Amino acid sequence: ISSDMKEKLALFCDVDKSAVIENLTAPTIYEVPLMMAKEGLDKIVLEKLHMDYSPANMEEWEKMVFKIKHPAKKVKVAVVGKYVDLPDAYMSVTEALHHAGIANDTDVKIAWVNSEAIEAADVELSEVFAGCKGILVPGGFGDRGVEGKIRAVQYARENAIPFLGLCLGMQC
């Protein structure tokens, strides 16, 4: 943001010019704290709160962001459930897989598999799980899709594919 634009924003938003910061679109949400620190947001907030300021050590965070943007490895994991058309239903599972990937310098790609779609015996599971290095069956409720989950568990067991079952997924 140009200095003139900052002055205009400060004037019409009733804030100090120094408190007008640029908020760019980030490739990953984890880069936002680094961008805000670069703009001096931490110092601005602490000054407004009349608190002492000392620069934060963001070295570990920077390393994490680098791993996210430049992973050394890639892996595909199948998530088998009945709500895969609404991936937000499995948000905690998705985030856990991505965080595990970050910790292991790996980009985790998720293959969403509808458990109801694989219930029939004529569905070729080797095609469904092609390239998957792990199968995860999350929790769920009711009987719908359970047979597909059981087939996924059996396929993982018989083909030595790492498997993680959560809640109902472990009971299958």
Give the residues covered by each predicted segment.
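N-terminal beta1-alpha1 cap of cysteine-dependent amidohydrolase-like domains
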Residues: 1-172
